[in-house]
Amino acid sequence: KYSNRHMTIGRVAHITEGTKPGLGRSNCQFRNRCRRGCPFGAYFSSNSSTLPAAEATGNMTLRTNSIVYEVIYDELNKRATGVKIIDSESNLTYEFKAKIIFMCASTVPTTSILMQSKSNRFPNGLGNDSGELGHNIMDHHFQIGADATYDGFEDKYYTGRRPNGIYIPRFQNIGGKTKNTNFLRGYGYQGGASRTDWTKYVKEASYGEKLKQAVIRPGEWTMGLNGFGEVLPYHDNKIFLDYNKTDKWGLPTVTFDAKLRENELNMRKDMQLQAMEMLDNAGFKNV
Protein backbone atom coordinates (compact mmCIF):
# COMPACT_ATOMS: atom_id res chain seq x y z
CA LYS A 1 0.00 0.00 0.00
CA TYR A 2 2.81 2.43 0.85
CA SER A 3 5.39 2.19 -1.91
CA ASN A 4 7.09 5.43 -0.84
CA ARG A 5 7.18 4.81 2.91
CA HIS A 6 10.01 2.86 4.47
CA MET A 7 10.44 1.77 8.07
CA THR A 8 14.09 1.40 9.04
CA ILE A 9 16.24 1.36 12.13
CA GLY A 10 16.93 4.81 13.52
CA ARG A 11 20.36 6.31 12.99
CA VAL A 12 22.53 7.64 15.78
CA ALA A 13 25.90 9.39 15.84
CA HIS A 14 27.75 6.29 17.04
CA ILE A 15 31.17 5.08 16.06
CA THR A 16 31.26 1.44 15.00
CA GLU A 17 34.83 0.29 15.64
CA GLY A 18 36.30 2.49 18.33
CA THR A 19 39.02 5.07 17.78
CA LYS A 20 42.77 5.48 17.79
CA PRO A 21 44.63 3.93 20.74
CA GLY A 22 44.69 6.19 23.75
CA LEU A 23 41.52 8.17 23.03
CA GLY A 24 39.44 5.83 25.16
CA ARG A 25 36.37 5.47 22.97
CA SER A 26 34.60 2.23 22.17
CA ASN A 27 31.53 1.22 20.26
CA CYS A 28 28.10 1.06 21.92
CA GLN A 29 28.00 -1.23 24.97
CA PHE A 30 24.19 -1.25 25.22
CA ARG A 31 24.32 -0.15 28.84
CA ASN A 32 21.55 2.48 28.73
CA ARG A 33 23.88 5.31 29.77
CA CYS A 34 23.09 7.53 26.79
CA ARG A 35 21.54 10.29 28.87
CA ARG A 36 24.68 10.56 30.97
CA GLY A 37 26.74 11.58 27.95
CA CYS A 38 27.88 8.03 27.12
CA PRO A 39 30.83 7.21 29.41
CA PHE A 40 32.07 4.79 26.73
CA GLY A 41 32.37 7.53 24.12
CA ALA A 42 30.31 5.55 21.64
CA TYR A 43 28.25 8.51 20.53
CA PHE A 44 29.71 11.92 19.94
CA SER A 45 29.85 14.45 22.73
CA SER A 46 32.58 16.93 23.57
CA ASN A 47 32.98 15.29 26.99
CA SER A 48 33.96 11.92 25.53
CA SER A 49 35.43 12.89 22.18
CA THR A 50 36.93 16.27 21.33
CA LEU A 51 37.84 17.47 24.83
CA PRO A 52 39.81 14.32 25.77
CA ALA A 53 41.52 14.46 22.37
CA ALA A 54 42.45 18.11 22.91
CA GLU A 55 43.68 17.40 26.43
CA ALA A 56 45.90 14.62 25.13
CA THR A 57 47.84 17.13 23.03
CA GLY A 58 49.00 18.91 26.18
CA ASN A 59 47.99 22.24 24.68
CA MET A 60 44.54 22.60 26.22
CA THR A 61 43.65 24.66 29.27
CA LEU A 62 40.14 24.03 30.56
CA ARG A 63 38.69 26.91 32.56
CA THR A 64 35.51 26.11 34.45
CA ASN A 65 32.93 28.48 35.95
CA SER A 66 33.44 30.86 33.04
CA ILE A 67 30.47 32.67 31.51
CA VAL A 68 31.31 34.04 28.08
CA TYR A 69 29.20 37.11 27.39
CA GLU A 70 30.97 38.95 24.57
CA VAL A 71 33.24 38.35 21.61
CA ILE A 72 35.90 41.06 21.36
CA TYR A 73 36.02 42.70 17.93
CA ASP A 74 39.13 44.53 16.75
CA GLU A 75 37.84 47.33 14.53
CA LEU A 76 41.31 48.19 13.27
CA ASN A 77 42.11 44.69 12.04
CA LYS A 78 38.46 43.83 11.35
CA ARG A 79 38.46 40.51 13.17
CA ALA A 80 37.41 38.86 16.40
CA THR A 81 40.37 38.62 18.75
CA GLY A 82 39.03 37.12 21.99
CA VAL A 83 36.20 36.83 24.47
CA LYS A 84 35.12 38.46 27.71
CA ILE A 85 34.02 36.22 30.55
CA ILE A 86 32.60 36.49 34.05
CA ASP A 87 33.89 34.09 36.68
CA SER A 88 30.66 32.68 38.10
CA GLU A 89 32.18 32.26 41.58
CA SER A 90 34.17 35.48 42.03
CA ASN A 91 32.11 37.70 39.69
CA LEU A 92 35.38 39.05 38.29
CA THR A 93 35.66 39.70 34.56
CA TYR A 94 38.52 38.52 32.36
CA GLU A 95 39.55 38.78 28.74
CA PHE A 96 41.09 35.93 26.78
CA LYS A 97 42.70 36.46 23.38
CA ALA A 98 42.92 33.92 20.58
CA LYS A 99 43.77 33.67 16.90
CA ILE A 100 40.65 31.59 16.21
CA ILE A 101 37.40 31.55 18.19
CA PHE A 102 34.82 28.77 17.97
CA MET A 103 31.28 29.53 19.14
CA CYS A 104 30.11 26.21 20.56
CA ALA A 105 27.60 27.30 23.19
CA SER A 106 24.60 25.70 21.39
CA THR A 107 21.96 27.62 19.48
CA VAL A 108 20.39 30.04 21.95
CA PRO A 109 23.43 30.89 24.15
CA THR A 110 25.61 31.36 21.06
CA THR A 111 23.04 33.73 19.59
CA SER A 112 22.83 35.57 22.90
CA ILE A 113 26.61 36.05 23.01
CA LEU A 114 26.67 37.38 19.45
CA MET A 115 23.82 39.78 20.22
CA GLN A 116 25.70 41.09 23.27
CA SER A 117 28.88 41.54 21.24
CA LYS A 118 28.22 45.14 20.17
CA SER A 119 30.73 47.58 18.73
CA ASN A 120 30.82 50.61 16.47
CA ARG A 121 31.10 48.24 13.53
CA PHE A 122 28.34 45.93 14.77
CA PRO A 123 25.93 48.05 16.87
CA ASN A 124 23.24 45.34 16.73
CA GLY A 125 25.47 42.39 17.52
CA LEU A 126 28.45 40.69 15.92
CA GLY A 127 27.77 39.76 12.30
CA ASN A 128 24.24 41.14 12.44
CA ASP A 129 24.29 43.51 9.48
CA SER A 130 21.13 41.84 8.16
CA GLY A 131 19.23 42.26 11.41
CA GLU A 132 18.25 38.60 11.27
CA LEU A 133 20.26 37.46 14.29
CA GLY A 134 17.83 35.90 16.76
CA HIS A 135 15.05 35.59 14.18
CA ASN A 136 13.72 32.59 12.23
CA ILE A 137 13.77 30.14 15.16
CA MET A 138 13.37 26.63 13.81
CA ASP A 139 13.06 23.33 15.64
CA HIS A 140 11.04 20.16 15.38
CA HIS A 141 7.44 20.25 16.45
CA PHE A 142 6.55 16.88 17.87
CA GLN A 143 4.60 15.01 20.56
CA ILE A 144 1.91 14.00 18.12
CA GLY A 145 1.28 10.72 16.33
CA ALA A 146 -0.49 7.54 17.39
CA ASP A 147 -0.06 4.33 19.36
CA ALA A 148 -1.90 1.04 19.33
CA THR A 149 -1.95 -2.53 20.62
CA TYR A 150 -1.38 -5.77 18.73
CA ASP A 151 -2.81 -9.23 19.35
CA GLY A 152 -0.36 -12.07 18.93
CA PHE A 153 3.36 -12.77 19.30
CA GLU A 154 2.68 -13.59 22.95
CA ASP A 155 5.57 -16.06 22.91
CA LYS A 156 8.01 -13.38 21.77
CA TYR A 157 10.01 -10.92 23.84
CA TYR A 158 13.11 -8.77 23.42
CA THR A 159 16.48 -8.45 25.09
CA GLY A 160 19.21 -5.83 25.23
CA ARG A 161 19.22 -2.06 25.34
CA ARG A 162 19.46 -0.86 21.77
CA PRO A 163 19.96 2.94 21.85
CA ASN A 164 17.39 3.66 19.17
CA GLY A 165 14.01 2.69 17.80
CA ILE A 166 12.52 2.65 14.31
CA TYR A 167 12.37 5.54 11.89
CA ILE A 168 10.08 6.34 8.96
CA PRO A 169 11.72 9.02 6.80
CA ARG A 170 9.79 11.89 5.32
CA PHE A 171 7.32 10.86 2.61
CA GLN A 172 5.25 14.02 2.06
CA ASN A 173 6.20 16.75 -0.42
CA ILE A 174 9.16 14.93 -1.93
CA GLY A 175 7.98 15.07 -5.53
CA GLY A 176 5.46 13.34 -7.75
CA LYS A 177 2.22 12.31 -6.12
CA THR A 178 3.48 13.12 -2.62
CA LYS A 179 2.66 16.83 -2.86
CA ASN A 180 0.40 17.97 -0.02
CA THR A 181 -1.51 21.18 -0.65
CA ASN A 182 -2.21 21.82 3.05
CA PHE A 183 1.37 22.46 4.12
CA LEU A 184 4.94 22.92 2.92
CA ARG A 185 7.88 20.65 3.78
CA GLY A 186 7.31 17.48 5.79
CA TYR A 187 7.97 15.21 8.75
CA GLY A 188 9.28 11.83 9.78
CA TYR A 189 8.34 9.37 12.51
CA GLN A 190 10.34 7.92 15.35
CA GLY A 191 8.83 4.97 17.12
CA GLY A 192 9.13 1.53 18.58
CA ALA A 193 7.32 -1.52 19.87
CA SER A 194 7.38 -3.09 23.31
CA ARG A 195 5.28 -5.11 25.73
CA THR A 196 3.49 -3.55 28.65
CA ASP A 197 4.77 -4.40 32.13
CA TRP A 198 3.85 -4.05 35.80
CA THR A 199 3.34 -0.29 35.48
CA LYS A 200 0.07 -1.11 33.78
CA TYR A 201 -1.27 -2.08 37.20
CA VAL A 202 -0.27 0.95 39.24
CA LYS A 203 -3.92 2.02 39.39
CA GLU A 204 -4.47 -0.95 41.74
CA ALA A 205 -7.43 -2.29 39.81
CA SER A 206 -6.69 -5.73 41.28
CA TYR A 207 -5.03 -7.13 44.39
CA GLY A 208 -3.73 -10.25 46.07
CA GLU A 209 -2.64 -13.34 44.16
CA LYS A 210 -4.33 -12.14 40.98
CA LEU A 211 -2.23 -8.98 40.99
CA LYS A 212 0.99 -10.90 41.76
CA GLN A 213 0.48 -13.22 38.81
CA ALA A 214 -0.39 -10.34 36.50
CA VAL A 215 2.69 -8.23 37.20
CA ILE A 216 5.17 -11.06 36.54
CA ARG A 217 3.84 -11.73 33.04
CA PRO A 218 4.59 -9.55 30.02
CA GLY A 219 1.58 -7.63 28.84
CA GLU A 220 0.27 -6.99 25.36
CA TRP A 221 2.37 -5.64 22.50
CA THR A 222 2.13 -1.93 21.82
CA MET A 223 3.62 0.26 19.14
CA GLY A 224 3.91 4.02 18.86
CA LEU A 225 4.71 6.40 16.02
CA ASN A 226 5.79 9.88 17.06
CA GLY A 227 5.98 12.55 14.40
CA PHE A 228 8.80 15.10 14.14
CA GLY A 229 7.90 17.92 11.76
CA GLU A 230 9.73 20.87 10.25
CA VAL A 231 9.07 24.46 11.28
CA LEU A 232 9.31 27.09 8.58
CA PRO A 233 11.63 30.09 9.12
CA TYR A 234 9.40 32.95 10.23
CA HIS A 235 11.00 36.31 10.90
CA ASP A 236 8.55 36.92 13.75
CA ASN A 237 9.64 33.74 15.54
CA LYS A 238 12.53 35.19 17.47
CA ILE A 239 14.52 35.58 20.65
CA PHE A 240 15.68 38.92 22.04
CA LEU A 241 17.70 40.21 24.97
CA ASP A 242 15.86 41.76 27.91
CA TYR A 243 18.20 44.29 29.50
CA ASN A 244 15.50 45.20 32.04
CA LYS A 245 15.51 41.66 33.41
CA THR A 246 19.05 40.53 34.10
CA ASP A 247 20.44 37.39 35.67
CA LYS A 248 22.54 37.17 38.85
CA TRP A 249 25.64 38.24 36.91
CA GLY A 250 23.98 41.31 35.46
CA LEU A 251 23.65 39.88 31.98
CA PRO A 252 20.47 40.31 29.94
CA THR A 253 18.11 37.36 29.92
CA VAL A 254 16.84 35.76 26.74
CA THR A 255 13.14 36.11 25.91
CA PHE A 256 11.40 33.85 23.42
CA ASP A 257 8.63 35.14 21.16
CA ALA A 258 7.71 32.24 18.91
CA LYS A 259 4.78 30.01 18.09
CA LEU A 260 3.62 27.32 15.69
CA ARG A 261 1.74 28.79 12.77
CA GLU A 262 -0.78 27.63 10.20
CA ASN A 263 1.65 25.51 8.20
CA GLU A 264 2.81 23.59 11.28
CA LEU A 265 -0.72 23.16 12.62
CA ASN A 266 -1.90 21.72 9.30
CA MET A 267 1.13 19.44 9.24
CA ARG A 268 0.34 18.17 12.74
CA LYS A 269 -3.12 17.09 11.63
CA ASP A 270 -1.55 15.01 8.88
CA MET A 271 1.10 13.62 11.22
CA GLN A 272 -1.61 12.20 13.44
CA LEU A 273 -3.86 11.07 10.59
CA GLN A 274 -1.14 9.18 8.72
CA ALA A 275 0.18 7.51 11.87
CA MET A 276 -3.29 6.25 12.76
CA GLU A 277 -3.89 5.05 9.22
CA MET A 278 -0.61 3.13 8.98
CA LEU A 279 -1.13 1.37 12.30
CA ASP A 280 -4.70 0.49 11.38
CA ASN A 281 -3.69 -0.89 7.98
CA ALA A 282 -0.95 -2.95 9.65
CA GLY A 283 -3.52 -4.77 11.77
CA PHE A 284 -3.12 -2.96 15.07
CA LYS A 285 -6.05 -2.36 17.39
CA ASN A 286 -7.07 0.37 19.81
CA VAL A 287 -5.39 2.97 17.61
Language-model-detected regions and their locations in the chain:
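Conserved redox-cofactor binding core of oxidoreductases
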Residues: K1-V68
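A glycine-rich dinucleotide-binding beta-alpha-beta segment and adjacent secondary-structure elements
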Residues: T8-G10, R31, Y69-I72, G82, ...
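Structural recognition of the beta-strand scaffold that forms the well-ordered cores
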Residues: I9, M103-C104, F240
